[in-house]
Amino acid sequence: MTQARFQRVLGRLVTDRDFRARLGHGAAGPRSGLSAIERRRLMAIAAAPGLALTARLIDSFRLGKLITLLPLTRALLGPVRFAREAEAYCAKVPPISFYLADEALAFCDHLRAACRRPYLAEVMGYERAMIELKRPRPDGAQRPSQRVVFEHDPGLVLPLLARGERPRAVPRRRHVAIGFLGADGVDWRIEAAGPAPRRASRQER
């Protein structure tokens, strides 16, 4: 059973930078299920420069997936803030799936807790809905429509972000968008639903 345990710890060294740093600086590693030789090997691997490079390559691959599926969210936050949040997310959350959709949705959950930015919730809601609509499903499985509530006119906000421009001072008016996958791709039906409710302003994070 030590081989399976060794492989699990080796995988953690690649994905958990804090664990890798502790072992690389001589901290006692996990003892359960490992021989003394295996523990020494893991400590040597943790200190090897090549392992950190491998971890950076994996993080870069994950960042590329997030940029692909969340381009409007990246445009809203800006490339620097988006990359910084992606780095924090990768440090906290090990790779959960090879599927782009799963990674992007988990990153949205991270952003929802980490960031407070005007337009962010509705833009992420829209991109999450697009991911769900395009997600591969088994043959015959239903693909439910997606509902997104915007507090600003999406006809103004989304085109600005698509051009790489951040929306500013867009009038608040609630819209409800219903998206569904048709024969020619994703279609949206958008209706104004009256003024958006006023909220106390919160400091951006």
Question: What is each residue range found by the language model?
Answer:
Residues 1-139:
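N-terminal, charged low-complexity regulatory/assembly segments
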Residues 87-202:
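Hydrophobic packing positions characteristic
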